[in-house]
């Protein structure tokens, strides 16, 4: 496998999908060099800058997404309609530098990968 896409489609709290996804990415980044992250649906909430997880007595692991640049992971994509549906269409709200794509181009980018793993 040359290129792997990790798709985050769940909210950061209430399940452990996001944290587990981040752990898997960090684990495989030493053997797979072309990794991209896609955020769609409630998954766009994973990368909000001003998440207040302490209000629900949860640990804020989402700030850990920032360390991905150390692992040379730089391809981050958000679904534009998912952002609009949640009232989040502003580039400065995210902890990562994301490329915001409409549904068509989001799918084109996703199809360019050899494997897709959803969290």
Curated annotation (Swiss-Prot):
Primary gene name: tusC
Subcellular location: Cytoplasm
Protein's GO biological process: tRNA processing
InterPro entries: DsrEFH-like, Sulphur_relay_DsrE/F-like, Sulphur_relay_TusC, Sulphur_relay_TusC/DsrF
Sequence similarity: Belongs to the DsrF/TusC family.
Keywords: Cytoplasm, tRNA processing
Gene3D superfamilies per record: DsrEFH-like
Role played: Part of a sulfur-relay system required for 2-thiolation of 5-methylaminomethyl-2-thiouridine (mnm(5)s(2)U) at tRNA wobble positions.
The protein's name in its UniProt record: Protein TusC
Domain of life: Bacteria
Keyword tRNA processing: yes
Lineage: Bacteria, Pseudomonadati, Pseudomonadota, Gammaproteobacteria, Enterobacterales
The keyword Cytoplasm is annotated on this UniProt entry: yes
Principal location: cytoplasm
Known partners and oligomeric status: Heterohexamer, formed by a dimer of trimers. The hexameric TusBCD complex contains 2 copies each of TusB, TusC and TusD. The TusBCD complex interacts with TusE.
SUPFAM superfamilies for the chain: DsrEFH-like
GO cellular component, one term: cytoplasm
């Amino acid at each position: 496998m040359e290129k792997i896409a990790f798709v985050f489609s769940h909210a950061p709290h209430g399940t452990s999908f996001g944290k587990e996804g981040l752990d898997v990415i960090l684990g495989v980044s030493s053997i797979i060099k072309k990794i991209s992250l896609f955020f769609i649906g409630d998954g766009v909430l994973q990368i909000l800058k001003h998440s207040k997880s302490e209000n629900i007595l949860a640990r804020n692991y989402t700030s850990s997404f920032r360390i991905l640049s150390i692992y040379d992971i730089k391809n981050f994509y958000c679904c534009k309609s998912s952002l609009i549906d949640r009232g989040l269409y502003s580039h400065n709200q995210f902890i990562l530098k994301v490329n915001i794509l409409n549904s068509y181009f989001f799918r084109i980018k996703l199809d360019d990968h050899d494997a897709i793993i959803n969290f």
